[in-house]
Each structure stands twice: as structure tokens, then as C-alpha cells.
Amino acid sequence: MTGKKRSASSSRWLQEHFSDKYVQQAQKKGLRSRAWFKLDEIQQSDKLFKPGMTVVDLGAAPGGWSQYVVTQIGGKGRIIACDLLPMDPIVGVDFLQGDFRDELVMKALLERVGDSKVQVVMSDMAPNMSGTPAVDIPRAMYLVELALEMCRDVLALGGSFVVKVFQGEGFDEYLREIRSLFTKVKVRKPDSSRARSREVYIVATGRKP
């Protein structure tokens, strides 16, 4: 019975996925994922990216966000990206494959950033979802806390942070923590984010001293 339910659920997901207008547009444009549109909407409202910036992309694969940011920061900009999964190369993106939760991977990522600070840290990280919020939300919150730690280490004063967060236990505390570190904080739900998803994007600008 469980197998039948899972099969029906998977079929619904596939049907929804392929009928999604953003998935269709991504395929037509040759984009790596529909996530490209989410970041485009955020950029239109918040103007995070400018030519020549250095950006850290966490949870980068398959590369939708990096693919978008390259068009905004130009040839003199730089992206340092990391994901547990492999990612096909993108010109202008320095990709590190590894588990961001691993201290050695974090160290390697910091070495790639080097001594100079970055202007934007962005995280689209999410754990493998079990479908049980009591399990999934704490896992997701752990990842976004790590992303915020990365901000503390590498983000320049006045820099920006954009992070995918799933609403649930710990969300309000996390939002308060970000507000203590940045001068302006917005919670965005892009049109290209599925309505039934718990995901929202926190956009924080103006890192405080």
C-alpha cells in the first residue's frame, strides 16, 4: 500500500514539475534549473549583484543560481560555488564538490575565498526531504545556520546574504539573528517558488560592523 501511495505521489510531482511554466521556460532558454527565475525575481527587487563582485554560492548544483549571477557580475566577477552533488563547469565559477557540513570541505572553501572578503553569500541548500516536518525542518535549519556562519567569516561590511529557509520551528529565531547582523532584511516568496512549498527566501543587505 505504501508503495502505491509513493508511486501516486511521485506521479503527481512529475506531472506538476513538467507542467510548471518555469520548468518549461527553463528548458526553452537552456537554463540549468527553474531556480534561475527565483534569483532573477530577487535581483529585480533587491539589486544584490553588480559587475566585478565576488559571490559564494552554497548548494549550487545543478548551477541555476551561478548561471544567473555570471550574467550580472561579468568577466571581472568571481563565483566560488560548493555542493555535495557534481556540477557541470560554468565559465567564471570555481566549483568545489563536497559536503558543506564537513570541516575539511569548509576549510577548502575558505581557502578558495582567500583573504579578501566577498560581496554576496547565497545559499539554496536543502536536505534530502523525508516528508516529515519534525525531521526535515531541523535538518534544514542546521544548513542555514552554517550558511550564516560562512557570512560571519567571509562577507564584507555592507555585503548581502540571500538564503532559502523553510518556514517552521526555528524560523523566527533565525530571522531575528539575521536582523541583528544586517541593516535591511526582507522575506521574499518569488512567484516562481511553488505556492504549496514552505520555502521562502530571506534577503539581507548591509552587513553591520
From Swiss-Prot:
Residue positions binding S-adenosyl-L-methionine: 63, 65, 83, 99, 124
MF terms (GO), sorted A to Z: rRNA (uridine-2'-O-)-methyltransferase activity
GO cellular component, one term: cytoplasm
Membrane-crossing segments per the record: none
Subcellular location as annotated: Cytoplasm
Reaction catalysis annotation: uridine(2552) in 23S rRNA + S-adenosyl-L-methionine = 2'-O-methyluridine(2552) in 23S rRNA + S-adenosyl-L-homocysteine + H(+)
Active site per the UniProt annotation: 164
Its EC number(s): 2.1.1.166
Listed InterPro entries: RNA_methyltr_RlmE, RNA_MeTrfase_FtsJ_dom, rRNA-MeTfrase_E, rRNA_MeTrfase_gammaproteobac, SAM-dependent_MTases_sf
Keyword set includes Lyase: no
Keyword presence, Cytoplasm: yes
Annotated Gene3D superfamilies: Vaccinia Virus protein VP39 (3.40.50.150)
SUPFAM superfamilies in alphabetical order: S-adenosyl-L-methionine-dependent methyltransferases
Keywords assigned by UniProt, alphabetized: Cytoplasm, Methyltransferase, rRNA processing, S-adenosyl-L-methionine, Transferase
Pfam short name (any one): FtsJ
Top EC class for this record: transferase
Location (main, coarse): cytoplasm
PANTHER family: RIBOSOMAL RNA METHYLTRANSFERASE, RRNA METHYLTRANSFERASE 2, MITOCHONDRIAL
Function: Specifically methylates the uridine in position 2552 of 23S rRNA at the 2'-O position of the ribose in the fully assembled 50S ribosomal subunit.
Family to which the UniProt record says this protein belongs: Belongs to the class I-like SAM-binding methyltransferase superfamily. RNA methyltransferase RlmE family.
UniProt protein name: Ribosomal RNA large subunit methyltransferase E
Organism name: Shigella dysenteriae serotype 1 (strain Sd197)
Lineage: Bacteria, Pseudomonadati, Pseudomonadota, Gammaproteobacteria, Enterobacterales
